[in-house]
Structures are given as C-alpha cells and as structure tokens.
Amino acid sequence: MAKQLLFNEEARKSLLAGVEQISNAVKVTLGPKGRNVLIDKSFGAPTVTKDGVSVAREVELENKFENMGAQLLKEVATKTNDVAGDGTTTATVLAYSMVKEGLKAVAAGMTPLELKRGIDKAVAIAVEDIQKNSKEIKGSEEVAHVASVSANNDAEIGKIIADAIAKVGKDGVIDVGEAQTMETVTDYVEGMQFDRGYISSYFVTDRDRMETVFENPYILIYDKSISTMKDLLPLLEQVAQSGRPLLIIAEDVEGEALATLVVNSLRGALKTCAVKAPGFGDRRKEMLEDIAVLTGGQVVSEELGFKLEAAQISMLGQAKSIKIDKDNTMIIDGAGKSKDIKDRVTQIKAQLDATDSEYDSEKLRERLAKLSGGVAVIKIGAVTEVEMKEKKHRVEDALSATRAAIEEGIVAGGGLAMIQAIAALEKADMSSLTEDEKVGFKIVKRALEEPIRQIAENAGLDGAVIAEKAKEKKGVGFDAAKMEWTDMVKAGIIDPAKVTRSALQNAASIASLLLTTECAITDIPEKQAGPAMPSPDMGGMGMY
C-alpha cells in the first residue's frame, strides 16, 4: 500500500494536534471536581468514567498523522496504568505540556536532542526529590485516605479497601466483582482457595448447599492421574483406621478408582472427596508444592522417588477444615509449619523480582497471596449497570493506588509534590548544561505546574494563580474539594509516590520521542467508493 509522508515542522504540528485532542478529553477528569466522560459503545449503554486510561483507550482520530500523536499519548496513560495502576490523567497532562512547550522550543531553533537531554536530567532530579520526600504509609487510616483520593474523594470506597487490606494483608489478593444488590459488600476467604471443585457431585456432604465440608481431614497431594484402585488401597486402609476424612488432589481421578471412592462415600465407610489439581504444566507442580507446604504434607511424586502404592499416612497434609463446591476448593487453617510457609513465601518473592513477564508476575502474586494472606472479594453494588461499571473503575483505580502507596510510600497530593520538585530543579547545578539543555529544564519545570493548574481549572479557578501561590506557600497545598489552602498530608490528601514518579517518567519518555521526530509516515487513506448508480430499466421500482 502507498504511504504518505510529512516532514519537519509540519509532521510535529500534526502529531501535536493529535496529542492535544486526547489531552483535552482526558484532563477534564483530573481532581476532586473533575468531570465525567461519556463513551459510546457499539452495543449496550454508554460508559461513564473518570478514569484517564479508559478515556484515552477509546480515542481513535480520523486524520492518520494526528492519530499517531494520539496513540503515542495513549501509550503514556497505558504504561503508567500498567506500572502504577493510577495517575494516568496526571501523566497525560504532563506529557502534553512537555510536548507543547518542547515543540515551541524546536520551532525557535533549539536542538531537539539537547532538549531531550535537558528533559531527562531534570526528570531524574525531580524523581529523586519525589522519592526523598515520600513517607512510609502507616495504619489503616492513611490507606483509606490514599484509596478515597484515588476514588474521586469517595470515603466509603477508601474504608472498604482499607478494611480489606487490613484483613488479607498487603500481599493478599483483593478481587473486584459485581454484586447482585445495590449494596457494596466484601467477602473474605480465610486460608487457601483454588479454582477446582469436586470431580463428582456424589462426594457432596451438604445437599442444600451442594458442598463437601470435612473437619480435620487428611490431604493426599499426587501429581499424576489415579485410575486403578490397587495403587491407592494401602493408603486408604491407613486413613480408614484413623477415622478421619480424606481429600485427594490429583491430576485426575477416573475409572475404577473414582467409582470405588464414590461407593465408599455413599456407604459412609470412608469420607472422601477428589478434586483435580489446580494450574497447568510446571505451574501445577509449583501449586501442589504450595499446598503441601501450607498443609504440612508431601507431594507424592515419582520424580521425587515416591510411589503412590508406597505412600504413608505421614506424607499426607492436614487442615482444620476444607470446603469444596463444584468450582472451588478452600483449605482452612492448614497444618504447615510457619517457618516452612515463610521460606516458601520468600522463594516466590525472589521469583517475582526475577521475572519480566506480566502474566508470570500475576500468577506468582496469586500464589503469594494464597500462602500469606488469603483473598477478599469486593462486590460492587449500584442502582444501574452504568453506575456500577463507573464505580467498579474507581474501586480498581483506588486499589492500584493503595498497593503503589504500600510499595513506595506517599507524598503530598493535589499536585503539590510536583510543585515541591520545582524547588529541587531550581537548586540544581546547571553550570555544565548547554543553553538548549537549560531550556529542557524549563520545559520540565513548566510541566510540573500543570497538574495543580488543571485541578484548579476543573474547580472553576485560575490555574496559573493557584500554581504561583502554591510555589510561595511552602508545604501547603490547595484542597480543591473544600476550596481552601491546607497541609495536604494532615488533611489526608495524599498520592502514592510510585504513581507520581511513574507519571512523570512516562510523560517525559513520550515527549522526548515526539520532540526528536523529523518525519511521520502513514498509509494513504482509501477513497470511499460512491453509491452505485441505479439501473436505467429500474426507474419504476418501489413506486406506488
């Protein structure tokens, strides 16, 4: 397909036009008085959101060159969301300011590469200042403040998230789902849960709830399929003598073995239940080992030199109770030693630090949570589906922001941390910089004012005036919700340092790319074919 090209100033102007459009759509959502954006869908009701990345993802411009600029800015929001889970609107606003001021400098004859170097050096100093000023998050109250600020000053959401984290711990899994009622509730799962249910409904002990519940069971953990009874019989006889129930976790239980277990369960001779092992491939082996550590048992595996027919009762795991339905198995209060569990958690954390894969990271975090904290499910309730989706977006943002705050600490919110970083740039030694690099510093200084300007403008005030006052008032920021100057940290208006840092770094990265662009190439749009001419012998068709 033929291509069209734009060069120099013309290319950069087209890219800027695209960046500006996406920035204008996103920036209206910033701050406590930010507005919603309504997004049309090809089916169903439109989506209402205040989430910057959700808005950015929907933007697709008709002009191909402008669309390239828009897609680059979309990358800022997406990357910030991936790294920190929040701060996407701030990142977008910062990037637009850097691109706009940077392109003015390029048009005035500055060297793009030197501007880029200046921007990179300034951002490094600002990031260092943000990290230096960050404070470790302490107590549920500060967790609630971070969450409520991210959820558009919704104190109820802040409290729900703070309570969930207090219950499952900072490594615990917190899932966000949809409730069937108008009320938002949190369900807690103590112990380990995995998504495999009973193989046969004949194992059910509670017919009303269709659940299998065992108290003080033994747990056999086996990494292969069981199809014949002779391999399992020696172990079953040992368990039967103890009078305790048995849960079998294996790759599969089928044929003669399954039939015999079902018959024994129905007769009451031996309470048993069989479930398939969670996960697949190597991940399955790791998860079986996790279950073994949690329950104080041993994975019966020929790879480790253990055969099923030679398995002893001492190899079995134990728990206070287990609950199994058709989809899930929950092991409550496993008998594993706390030292072994702690060592296993440390091992998984090391794997988490070493992996680059987002998918692997997610699965490792899930395993970590199952071992160390348990699971909380926040079920979002609302009057309408549109409201529920909007609220769910805010809860997910708040949850991500809270995790980021626990990880890297908190800084003053409302754009104040960035205003304070300007002071660090003004104190920096610029004697070794070229004139163009100094302009790069000025571009970053101007961009750091932009979040507080936009928050003020969304509250109906003059952003430039508020930004100047914030620079004069040391350590005091503007609370746009109450329209007053206050100590932001004491007032609970705080942002995660990771969110602020990531927003600035990602904005600078994309801005630098745009400033150093000299040519843009895209496909020539295909011309739309006109409507077909009617056939001359069909003139009377459709006439009455």
UniProtKB/Swiss-Prot annotation:
Forms a cylinder of 14 subunits composed of two heptameric rings stacked back-to-back. Interacts with the co-chaperonin GroES. Keywords: ATP-binding, Chaperone, Cytoplasm, Isomerase, Nucleotide-binding. This is Chaperonin GroEL. Together with its co-chaperonin GroES, plays an essential role in assisting protein folding. The GroEL-GroES system forms a nano-cage that allows encapsulation of the non-native substrate proteins and provides a physical environment optimized to promote and accelerate protein folding. It is found in: Cytoplasm. Its EC number is 5.6.1.7. Belongs to the chaperonin (HSP60) family. It catalyses: ATP + H2O + a folded polypeptide = ADP + phosphate + an unfolded polypeptide. GO terms for cellular component: cytoplasm. GO terms for biological process: protein refolding. It is an enzyme of class 5 (isomerase). InterPro entries: Chaperonin_Cpn60_CS, Cpn60/GroEL, Cpn60/GroEL/TCP-1, GroEL-like_apical_dom_sf, GROEL-like_equatorial_sf, TCP-1-like_intermed_sf. GO terms for molecular function: ATP binding; ATP-dependent protein folding chaperone; isomerase activity; unfolded protein binding. ATP binds at residues 29-32, 50, 86-90, 414, 479-481, 495. PANTHER family: 60 KDA HEAT SHOCK PROTEIN, MITOCHONDRIAL.
